Amino acid sequence: MGKEKNPGRGKNRIELKKGTINIMKKLEEYVISIPDFPEPGIIFRDITSILQDPDGLKLAIDSLLAMVKDVDFDVVVGAESRGFIFGTPVAYALGKAFVPARKPGKLPRETVSMEYALEYGTGTIELHKDSIKPGQKVVIIDDLIATGGTVEAIAKLVEELGGEVVKICFVMELAGLKGRDKLQKYDVDSAIIYEGK
């Protein structure tokens, strides 16, 4: 018998069934927390530890697939760079297109760009001008929501190109940084929610 995936009861669980054995795993078990990095008082949540474990990676992708299973959409947009890692398998599994949102100068064709605020200064994100067609329904995927600035800028670019953002998905959320506040008009979901910063 193969493995079947079912969304768990909470936002951060995926239930795996193997034969008659029912195994519940929490995705956060795969995240290594590093205290006092990059500065004292900060707990750094290392998402790369999810990627290094085959079960952790599968749980992360299955979590994202569960978030979009009832969503009607055409395109996945992934934010540079870990949004590529998590967004591409979702697009592949569901037979959807994948569009990379990149930093300036990385896309070879004509682009549209949006500047957004960072903690110290500003950043810019770009999409190919022809990557989203008017009327297309878009799911945006990224690894982490902190302040929400990057994904807010991507959503605005999608809308500028005539697309509709129907869902935004994250593997991890740092709720203390209030990134959701910038994304209130969108349907936002996170696999893991940490209450702190």
Provide a role label for each language-model segment.
Residues 2-9, 13:
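Ser/Thr/Pro/Gly-rich low-complexity, intrinsically disordered segments
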Residues 11-23:
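Short, Lys/Arg-enriched N-terminal segments with co-localized hydrophobic residues
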Residues 74, 136, 166:
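Conserved acidic residues
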Residues 97-139:
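Short, glycine/charge-rich flexible loops or terminal/linker lids adjacent to PRPP-binding catalytic cores
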